[in-house]
């Protein structure tokens, strides 16, 4: 299990680097996302979906964690970290830069990540799997449009032609 987790960690870092995403370890990652172009975040989000659904190693890891979370506390924690609470908290930290409250940031994280998480299962059950990624793409585009409409930066960091995500 430790080798599987290490391989997953390596794949995560490599994918984040390939899509030029801010590093996840430093305290300033949420601030760094504020300056990441929307196109990169969109592409990375779609790549994450492909990672968890189409890449055999990662998809099998996800399925294993989904099943085994109910049998083994260690696997339940891994499921939480990789697929449930971990991504949700990560996104809430990013959205906290836009909102007035932690609750509002968490709601935005749920609004963004909830459909993605659901679509993992939709993908698994779909006879025509190629129909699922376009649903996620449409969700992400609508979410971005909503964020860009409702939330504005203050001062020098106003949106510039829709090039920034948050």
Can you name each region flagged by the protein language model?
Residues 13, 17-20, 24, 53, ...:
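Short, flexible helix-adjacent loops and helix caps
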Residues 35, 39, 52-66, 70-100, ...:
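Amphipathic alpha-helical packing segments from all-alpha helical-bundle domains
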């Amino acid at each position: 299990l430790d080798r599987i987790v290490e391989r997953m960690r390596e794949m995560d870092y490599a994918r984040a680097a390939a899509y030029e995403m801010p590093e996840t370890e430093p305290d300033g990652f949420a601030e760094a996302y504020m300056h990441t172009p929307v196109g990169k975040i969109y592409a990375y989000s779609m790549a994450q979906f492909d990672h968890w659904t189409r890449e055999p190693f990662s998809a099998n890891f996800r399925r294993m964690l989904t099943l085994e979370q109910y049998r083994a506390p260690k696997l339940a924690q891994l499921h939480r970290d990789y697929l449930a609470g971990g991504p949700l908290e990560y996104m809430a930290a990013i959205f906290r830069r836009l909102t007035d409250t932690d609750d509002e940031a968490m709601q935005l994280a749920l609004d963004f990540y909830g459909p993605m998480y659901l679509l993992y299962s939709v993908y698994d059950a779909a006879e025509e799997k190629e129909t699922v990624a376009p649903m996620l793409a449409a969700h992400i585009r609508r979410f971005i449009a909503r964020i860009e409409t409702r939330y504005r930066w203050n001062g020098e960091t106003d949106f510039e032609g829709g090039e920034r995500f948050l």
